[in-house]
Amino acid sequence: CADYLFDLAELGVAGVNFHGSFNCRGYTSFCALKNGGYHVHGHYYGMLFFRQAARGRVVTLTRSGDGANLTGHAVLGDDGSLRVALINKDLESDAKVAIHLPERSGQASVMRLRAPAIDAKNDITLGGAGVAADGTWKPKSTESIAAQDGIYPIEVPAASAALLVIGAERPGTPADPAEPSSRPR
């Protein structure tokens, strides 16, 4: 889902509508539970990952090498941060990535999208946290990666994604300071 949304953003598409239902049968991004809460599906986590990654202007990312079925997308934030979304669609192979940014230095924050299996319906996390039954989400964990001679090394496990933020903002901070969390609406 996130990869598709990035493809559309890179083509200049300004909005996307996804269809679903509020019952928990069939395929939907999230559904309303009978007890009044929400249950989100994998598709929703892809949209949430995109929301965290796509805060700014899409910029070109050049890829070299081969190996895992890995895609990458980059966004330059208004605050000067560079957000690099790495999506490993390979079901078996981890991807070792070296992001070359000779003009940047210092620490980068990494937030990961993980699931126990590619078709998981539960235990999916972004930033070490799942979306709560009330629809709120607040990341619990990020990693730090230091540049080594202008290169940020990162490993992206099979069937997972990582958001690397170099610069002013940590991944998982609200897009709008008045909005303390991200939740389905």
Name every feature range the model reports, one short phrase each.
Residues 1-81:
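Aromatic/acidic polysaccharide-binding cleft in carbohydrate-active enzymes
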Residues 17, 23-29, 91-94, 117-120, ...:
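Flexible loop/turn segments at secondary-structure boundaries
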Residues 67-106, 110-117, 159-165:
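Carbohydrate-binding surface patches
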Residues 104-152:
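Acidic, Ser/Thr/Pro-rich beta/coil linker or hinge segments at domain junctions
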Residues 142, 161, 182-183:
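Compositionally biased regions
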Residues 164-172:
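Short beta-strand-to-coil "C-cap" segments at the C-terminal boundary of structured domains/repeats
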Residues 173-185:
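Mature N-terminal, pre-catalytic/accessory segment of carbohydrate-active enzymes
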